[in-house]
Amino acid sequence: MNFWIGTSGFQYSEWKGNFYPEDLPTAKMLPFYAERFTTTEINYTFHRIPAQKTIENWKAQTPEKFRFALKAPQKITHWAKLRDCSDTLEYFCKVVTDLDDRLGPVLFQLPPTFKKDADVLSSFLRELPSMRAAFEFRNESWFDDEIFDLLKSRNVALCIADTDTIATPRSITADYGYLRLRREDYTADDVKRWSEFVREQSTSWSDAFIYFKHEESGIGPKLARQMIDLLEES
């Protein structure tokens, strides 16, 4: 199994002094980050579809063995709620595939008010191009076998999100995994337990994408490093 472990985002001035050097320019944060981690989750794409120049800059500043997980546009997940958005989906996917091998999964994070609608999800999955994707459901009504089976039918990952308000069932729906570890604080034992869970999926997953919450204190990179060290040891 390949482990892709990092944080949600990388460009935080609050990290200067505890992760980034105090005098590091913002423009050099991504290369610095990419020397230490192999992936990051980009929230920028939730607000706007990136320009070609942005895609090229991301590629130029990272090594070949680096992966960008991209949050799908809110126009798809929040405004349209997966309905009647084929043009936006097609355009977004066309743009981001220019990342080539650096493209990781696309995260479709649904709003908490969006309750289960299996027909809508099924229709959307039929329109989704052949690419790695993960769905983060933030309403518990989605957590049942009907939804998990739909994801399995398209080899789409259920995003296993661990938050202070909701914990996603640890259901395996694809041959890769996607974890978002979002609680305010994780102990060393917590990180160890999650690393053990990831290791246990070695027969199911070829790749595991794992993202810690960024946190203003800069604890996210430290937790990501802890998990990397644990998985490299085992």
Q: Language model features by range: what are they?
A:
Residues 1-234:
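Residues lining hydrophobic/aromatic ligand-binding pockets adjacent to catalytic sites
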